[in-house]
């Protein structure tokens, strides 16, 4: 019988010698104020009850704000951000980001890329004033919402709209 141990040890040594460039991470928050810092890969972070900070970095991140007043910063990839029940502050990144709001009075700032921002319920503020040649879409949902958008962008359901060129 031939022993496979030397072969397995050689494979393990090769795998350990190869540096890990990025490993996607999934993490869930607690009832405290949690901080999640992204990796270059596509991460998934879930805030919970505290006033959390969720920061994407690279890749297509999935960021879920919780019940607190959270700060969510999207990264360079095409990120999906879901607001929570608190008054969240969301800053879109460089990719074509998607945002779905929760029940609080959210502040949402679009970034570079063709962002789709849906604020949901609550009295929200949306700022999309970067002229990057991409068309952003803003749906303010219900509530008394304020939007500052570029003349190329699309908006619906926003009560107070300022268009800049």
Indicate residue ranges for each PLM-predicted region.
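Bacterial N-terminal signal peptides that target proteins for export
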Residues: 1-8
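Glycine-centered beta-turn/loop sites at beta-strand termini
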Residues: 29, 37-38, 46-47, 56, ...
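Consensus positions within tandem repeat domains that build extended binding/scaffold surfaces
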Residues: 33, 42, 51, 60-62, ...
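Bacterial N-terminal signal peptides
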Residues: 9-17
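Leucine-rich solenoid repeat scaffolds
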Residues: 128-165
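Alpha-helical transmembrane bundles and membrane-interface segments of multipass inner-membrane proteins
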Residues: 26-28, 32-34, 71, 80, ...
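Sec/Tat signal peptide C-region and signal peptidase I cleavage site
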Residues: 20-26
């Amino acid at each position: 019988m031939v022993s496979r141990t030397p072969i397995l040890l050689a494979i393990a040594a090769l795998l350990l010698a190869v540096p890990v460039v990025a490993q996607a991470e999934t993490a869930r928050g607690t009832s405290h104020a949690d901080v999640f810092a992204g990796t270059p890969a596509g991460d998934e972070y879930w805030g919970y009850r505290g006033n959390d900070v969720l920061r994407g970095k690279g890749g297509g991140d999935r960021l879920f704000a919780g019940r607190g007043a959270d700060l969510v910063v999207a990264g360079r990839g095409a990120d999906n951000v879901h607001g929570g029940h608190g008054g969240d502050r969301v800053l879109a990144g460089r990719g074509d980001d998607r945002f779905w709001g929760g029940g609080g009075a959210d502040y949402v700032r679009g970034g570079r890329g063709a962002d789709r921002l849906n604020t949901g319920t609550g009295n929200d503020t949306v700022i999309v004033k970067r002229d990057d040649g991409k068309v952003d879409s803003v749906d303010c949902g219900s509530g008394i919402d304020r939007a500052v958008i570029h003349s190329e962008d699309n908006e619906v359901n926003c009560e107070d709209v300022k268009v800049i060129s």
